[in-house]
């Protein structure tokens, strides 16, 4: 069984943390985030540390308090360092470009895919075949990266499509004559 929840989350200098009932709010150099903790989990702010523990000794509460602690730790990391996901585009004629506040993707369709960038997320295109998604909320960064990937997921025969950097694509052999 994991013991992640037992470790307190340190609040670094430059970050202000407030706990109001079940809501944990963080404010730092990269922005402001908040997270509502489940009712079965108790959250306390004590001497620059946030401590998470289950209210009851039920299996559900014990299962949730480690998750709640990890979510609070992600809030701290998000407002200090931020999060980043990198995507890679593979395929002939497949490319990405910024078009104002939108991301324009040429992915082999008869039309270009225009992705509107949500607020709080920054997308950069260092090369036409690379996309970098950054932001302070780990969930939103991952969601945006997954939405972009879903326009053309990598296929198993040639590996064409949009994939995460470092993602392994299971390759298949083509049919034989």
UniProtKB/Swiss-Prot annotation:
SUPFAM superfamilies per UniProt: Ribosomal protein L6
Pfam families: Ribosomal_L6
Alphabetized GO MF terms: rRNA binding; structural constituent of ribosome
PROSITE patterns: RIBOSOMAL_L6_1
Keyword Ribonucleoprotein appears in the UniProt entry: yes
Keyword annotations of the record: Ribonucleoprotein, Ribosomal protein, RNA-binding, rRNA-binding
Subunit structure: Part of the 50S ribosomal subunit.
Protein purpose: This protein binds to the 23S rRNA, and is important in its secondary structure. It is located near the subunit interface in the base of the L7/L12 stalk, and near the tRNA binding site of the peptidyltransferase center.
Protein name: Large ribosomal subunit protein uL6
């Amino acid at each position: 069984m994991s013991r992640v929840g037992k470790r307190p989350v340190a609040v670094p200098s430059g970050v202000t943390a407030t706990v109001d009932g079940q809501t944990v709010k963080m404010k730092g150099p990269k922005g402001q985030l908040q997270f509502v903790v489940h009712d079965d989990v108790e959250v306390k702010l004590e001497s620059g540390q946030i401590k998470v523990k289950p209210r009851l000794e039920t299996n559900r509460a014990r299962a949730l308090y480690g998750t709640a602690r990890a979510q609070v730790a992600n809030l701290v990391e998000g407002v200090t360092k931020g999060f980043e996901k990198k995507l890679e585009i593979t395929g002939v004629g497949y490319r990405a470009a910024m078009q104002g506040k939108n991301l324009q993707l040429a992915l082999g369709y008869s039309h270009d895919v225009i992705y509107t960038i949500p607020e709080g997320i920054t997308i950069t295109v260092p090369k036409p075949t690379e996309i970098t998604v950054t932001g302070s909320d780990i969930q939103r960064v991952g969601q945006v990266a997954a939405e972009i990937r879903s326009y053309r997921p990598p296929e198993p025969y040639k590996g064409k499509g949009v994939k995460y950097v470092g993602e392994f694509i299971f390759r298949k052999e083509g049919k034989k004559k």
